[in-house]
Amino acid sequence: MLSPPKFPKKERDSHSWLLLAIAILLFPFTVLAESIQVARFTSGERQVSYEIVGLESSGPLIIMLHGASGPGVPLYRGLAQYFATKNYTVLFLHYFDAADTFRASDQNYIAWEKAVSDLVGECRKNPKWSNRKIALLGFSLGASVALAAGSQAIPVNAVAEWYGSLPDEFFFRLKGMPPLLILHGQHDDNITVANAQQIMQLCRMKSFTCGSHIYPDQGHGFKPPAYDDAVKRTLDFFSYQLR
């Protein structure tokens, strides 16, 4: 049975690239032989790229948002290919293209959130995708971008965020939130668990549809078996919300 690829404990780990290189060689990509296609669209007068994985899949779309290390981390593509084997089409968005810097500033969050919203608009204009349901899946900084987009009542069917936070700029101008899954580590010293708890409280106050799980032994980034559990929870959540 094909298993999801393994992420390193932390994106900032100095040995991440070695771990990724080893893991990527072990991951059986031959199961999914199709090549990754690259497309572009305009957002805020800038050209933004995204990779399409699972183009032949007929199921829902997942817009995947990378973390602070950027889209070059190979295992994001590995996870995208794993989701494609489950009949999802994954759009791996290079949202950094939408701003001049990679800094997590209010200005950049606004540009990145707009890129996500504009990509959803592109999907709705595409005859092959216009009737498909859409989910957002973000990791760390990308999870914060997904939450920012969700807070503006973006017309998607689900949002899954792994160890992110809702940026203050978007917290204060909240418009809504699609059904949300929050996954976080109790010992996260990068984006603390208080951020997840704040979003959970917001969901209760606003009566948003929200599921959550706090891993008691995890930090920023999940190690097996928590990682495998997070993948399963995400797939189960999408299967239910995108049915």
What is the meaning of each model-derived region?
Residues 33-55:
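N-terminal cap/lid segment of alpha/beta-hydrolase-fold proteins
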Residues 59-67:
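Short beta-strand element of the alpha/beta-hydrolase
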Residues 66-71, 186:
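Active-site glycine-rich loops that stabilize anionic/oxyanionic intermediates
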Residues 71-79, 95, 195:
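The serine-hydrolase catalytic nucleophile loop
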Residues 87-100:
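Conserved alpha/beta-hydrolase
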Residues 106-126:
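Alpha/beta-hydrolase active-site loop
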Residues 207-243:
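C-terminal catalytic histidine-bearing segment of alpha/beta-hydrolase fold enzymes
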